[in-house]
Amino acid sequence: MLFRSYISVATGEIFGAWVDLRPGESFGQVYTTRLDPSRAIFVPRGVGNSFQALEDGTAYTYLVNAHWSLEQKKTYTFVNLADPDLGIEWPIPLSECELSEADKAHPMLKDAKPMAPRRTMVTGCNGQLGRAVRRYVEEHGLEGFEFNDIDTFDFSDPAQYDRFDWSLYGAIINCGAYTAVDKAETLEGRAAAWKANAQGPALLARVAAEHNITLVHVSSDYVFDGTHELHDETETFAPLGVYGQSKAAGDLSVANCPRHYILRSSWVIGEGHNFVRTMKTLSDRVANGELAQVTVVDDQYGRLTFTSDMAEAIFHLLDTGAEYGTYNLTSEGESASWYEIARTVFNLANHNGDKVQPVTTAEYYANASGPVSPRPEHSTLELTKIEGTGYIPANWEGKLEKYLNM
């Protein structure tokens, strides 16, 4: 059966035979029994189902979690119920039964394909984290993944959800978000931030709850006001700006989904535009004589989070079946200011860290032409909880050096 089903008999009696077609050690195991109105049986997804009616007028019923569709049929797997290797002792010889041509054509157990796992949908696949997740999937040869960005599935649009048969999906990894922190303080940006960061996750959480899907969602240090030097997963939200407020709202929605992982990160570095790449470019320009020096804020403290580590941590939680909930995830190591990280990048790139000068956040944005979102002073996240699952984050300084050498 593709579906999970609850089978009962209203009248009469049947002989039922079930073959486990799920991948793993139980593949090919057979279970048989007789059912009458006094008994019922639950059949998990991926277990082949067959029966014989033993009395005239037998009524045999299914309660299923999904219905047949052409898309569903593409995921079916079969085994031939006449295969002697199954050892099924049919009360009525199969030679006396009516079998469809499809039943007769089903493969023997030795040729049967294991039931494929439910699909995993990745949203926001073209962002920094989305690209890291895709790369992880490709490098590990994982199957059953579907990658979407806003052009193929805008998860913040309620009208787009009916396009999918959600019973086919076992997990959603939401890598999409609105991350223009300062632009979120504008009229246009505020609406966009709330649509992507609050409404979108709420819609994903609803569909995940309705279809028993595990939802993976990424949070931000901006849900806190930064007054505590170290933030654990139990700290109360106190976002300072619109971006942080919209992310906090999304977190609250996802937390109501029974099967969820929220990974809270800070200072994300991956493929594409980010702070480290900007500092590397500026270091090169200083080395080439195009710039004399640069200024970087020295009153915000935290740790970098590399998207390659985020992807590994996501699959670690999914694969190990860790307890659902919220997990902080950054690189480990001493907290540092943006200024200290910039000096490290300059020294690694061109040994010119002395050309980075410290400045306060207020001084840095003193001449800004547009709105500026308030930033948390302290963004360092406590990592004890995720380490308790067996995932040990890498040191940010070592990861930074490897990142610059890629």
Predicted segment positions?
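Active-site region of the double-stranded beta-helix
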Residues: 1-36, 52-117, 301
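NAD(P)-dependent short-chain dehydrogenase/reductase
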Residues: 252-302, 308-309, 315
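NAD(P)H-binding glycine-rich loop region in Rossmannoid oxidoreductase-like domains
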Residues: 158-196, 209
